[in-house]
Amino acid sequence: MQSTKEHRAFLIGRFQPFHLGHLEIVKRILRENDSIIIGIGSAQYSHTTVNPFTAGERHLMISRTLEREHVYNYYLVPIEDVNANSLWVSHVEALAPKFDVVYTNNPLVRRLFTEKHYEVRSLPMVNRSEWTGTKIREKMIKGENWEQNVPEPVVEVIREIDGISRIRQLSTTDEDVP
């Protein structure tokens, strides 16, 4: 008899912005699981050079991308940071639907979920030389081609919110103001 239990995965990231590497990882996870919970990490942060986009903006980037890719078996959950690592997994569990497996390469996240007896799987790194949030944000600031590294719906959201102007302004200091 075949099991009817749904296998639901959990993936956490800041998605600043959601890029092609993230999209590829989501698709790979969904080949092994029935659905995925995507935790939008550090949800309380925005308007900094490291976290320029709000949780709501990141939600739009991800949901529009997945809809365009005809992926509908996902949940998006904003997750704020807590200042006590030992409580973080319980915090995630309180916010997210139940899940069976966690996907991460982050050593701290791996440790915290392992201590709570979750199955934790590693993620393959996909085109890491180009597809990192840090490199994409740097390209935005420098006026270089960043669009090729993110899905088209992400480009659209960033343009809608004037995200390039925002991140460029955030990257300046008061000494840069005339």
Curated annotation (Swiss-Prot):
CDD domains from the UniProt entry = NMNAT_Archaea
Pathway(s) of this molecule: Cofactor biosynthesis; NAD(+) biosynthesis; NAD(+) from nicotinamide D-ribonucleotide: step 1/1
Catalytic EC class: transferase
Matching Gene3D superfamilies, A to Z? HUPs (3.40.50.620)
Q: Where in the cell is it found?
A: Cytoplasm
Q: Which UniProt keywords apply?
A: ATP-binding, Cytoplasm, NAD, Nucleotide-binding, Nucleotidyltransferase, Pyridine nucleotide biosynthesis, Transferase
EC number in record: 2.7.7.1
Which biological process terms from the Gene Ontology are attached to this UniProt entry?
A: NAD biosynthetic process
Q: Which GO terms describe its molecular function?
A: ATP binding; nicotinamide-nucleotide adenylyltransferase activity
Q: Where is it mostly found?
A: cytoplasm
Q: Please, which domain of life does this record's source organism belong to? A: Archaea
Q: Which reaction does it catalyse?
A: beta-nicotinamide D-ribonucleotide + ATP + H(+) = diphosphate + NAD(+)
GO CC, any one term: cytoplasm
Concerning its family, UniProt says: Belongs to the archaeal NMN adenylyltransferase family.
Q: PANTHER family, per this entry? A: BIFUNCTIONAL NMN ADENYLYLTRANSFERASE_NUDIX HYDROLASE, PHOSPHOPANTETHEINE ADENYLYLTRANSFERASE
Q: Which HAMAP family match?
A: NMN_adenylyltr
Protein's recorded name: Nicotinamide-nucleotide adenylyltransferase
* Native source organism of the sequence: Thermoplasma volcanium (strain ATCC 51530 / DSM 4299 / JCM 9571 / NBRC 15438 / GSS1)
**Taxonomic classification:** Archaea, Methanobacteriati, Thermoplasmatota, Thermoplasmata, Thermoplasmatales
